[in-house]
Each structure stands twice: as C-alpha cells, then as structure tokens.
C-alpha cells in the first residue's frame, strides 16, 4: 500500500527503503543543547582539513564558475593514472560524486531488479541502500568472531545463489576497522572467478587504504592486475580531507567501466572539486602528515580506552570501534547521548548491527582530549551508579 494515498505509487522497494543517516551535525547539536563548544568525532573526516594546495586550486577555479566543468575530467584522470602507476590508462577510472555515486553506478550497470549483491554484515550501508534503490537484494553473511569479513562464508553464499552479480568487500572495513589478508582475498577471488558460468564482479572498497599500517593487507592494484573481475574503490573524502567536495573513483577495466560511463550523469563533479582533487593528489607531504597524525591519534584513543577498561578492536582506519557495553555497561546509543550532553559527537553503530559499540573518529589533539574527557566523565558516572 502506498505511503501517500492519492499520489502515484513508488515501487515497494523504494517505499521500504531506510535512508542513510549521517553523523549528527555540529550546528544542530549546539542549537538543540545550547552548547558553546561541540566536537565531532563521528564521521571519519580528516581533522587537518584539506591540503592548502587543494584549497588554493579550488579557489582559483572560482573565476570560471559560469562555465561547465570538464565532463571527462581529463586532467584528474591522467593525474590518477600517474599516481597509481602500473601502466594504467585514464580510461580505467570511473569518477563519481563521492564513492556513493560510483557504487550506485556499478550496481545500476551490472545488476537488474530481482538480482542480488553480496557483502558482510556491518559493512558500509551504502552498498545495501544503493542496491535496494534499484530493486536489487542484498545478501549479508555474518562477521567472524573478531569482526572481520568471513570470506569463506561469503564465497559459499555467492556460489549458492545464482542471483548474485556483485560482491562488495571493504578492506579495511568501516565501522569495525578490521581487515582481511592477502591470502584470504586471493582464496576468495579464486573461488568466485567463474560462478554459474559467469564471472561475478568483486568490488574492493579501499577508502581507508592510505591509513593502513598492517603488512598483510594486499595492495589492491596487484589483485586488480591479476583478476579481471575486480574493481577497486578509492575516495578523496578521507586522508585527502575533501569530504565536502565529494570525489570518489573506481579503478577497473576500460571495457567494464565504459558501460558505467553510459549512465553517468554529465558534469557530476564540479570544477572546484576537480581542481582540489588534482592538487590534493600531488601534495604527498600533506598526506604523510595526515597519516602520521592519525597514527598518533589512534594510539591516544587506544591508551584512553585501555585506561577506561573499554574493549576495542585494532583499527586500520582513522577511527576505533569501542565495545562500550562490556566496558561501561551501557549501549552505544546510551553512551552517545550522554557524551552528546558534554559536547562530543561520537557515532553509534546500532544500524550496522552493533548496538553495543561506539565508533570514535580520530580528531586533532585538542579534539581527542576533549572527547576523552567526556567519555571519562560518563565512565565515572557509571562507576558511581548514575546514568
């Protein structure tokens, strides 16, 4: 039955779709709670902001805003090809208004209504949202006990269900921060290279690749070169600090991505976004600075959580997942609301099937200390029997 009687009816898969819920905005929190200072450690943004070179490039482009941007993104495609090397062609890149658009384009191109994608529980919710928006089902396999993608179970699900057209694997995963090894991924890719007489498209989401320190996470370009059914996702929203510009991209075979290009809307990236992304890519010193700051921030939060006796998982991203239920006896949403009153926005992840956990993004040194004080105050309140 239509949600709005008397109006044209949308398909049921649209009517039942739960939209993406972003992290709570700073200004909204100030307004609702009457707080002067609010620190947001919720959306895995780069606390250093964009590279100064990216800001300058975007500002320089403003004088030409009466012109349409380059629909083919010639300069950025060539810059990306040089950046990733491995003799890549500019035609092996699909650019989108954030990775979300790229995910949407891949699903629209390679899955029909009634077919399916496969991923894991507690994976990036955009996979499921984009799939459902096009009448495509999402099959989710459980995480392992240590909150990693269970690639053995995922392979079995893909082999078992002939409707699966795409598989999404985030490495490392958000919101858990956990990762899968090269050996695990190679075994998985070998199993799904030909299923039911056809290859399944495997999308490796490497949004947090620049932050990775673990030695057993494979370079996605090696896997892309060896497995023609692999597509790799990257974003400028994380280490490059361009979340507000909305620039994401896929690396895949020219033949595969050319079909996505047919349905990509023209001018999907603004001229300032194109200019900022190209400049950010060239500023290697800024990226190194951001990675070093993130590692220091992760160490700070790991020490803080250890001191408060709140269990947490090793993270390869710019955030840490804390089991506040075991540590404080409160659910993730409960701790979120208590910290909100102290002016700190963390991220509850009950919508990922993790109601006992809270995701903490790394901020600046000052933001991290402010967030830690709020969490410590909540911890003391629980020890004293107060909620």
Residue ranges and their predicted role:
Residues 143, 295, 307-342, 358, ...:
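Conserved PLP-binding catalytic core of the aspartate aminotransferase-like
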Residues 183, 193, 334, 338-342, ...:
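PLP-dependent enzyme catalytic core of the Aspartate aminotransferase-like
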Residues 91, 232, 308-311, 343-349:
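A short linear hydrophobic-aromatic micro-motif
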Residues 63-195, 208-226, 231, 277:
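Conserved core of the PLP fold type I
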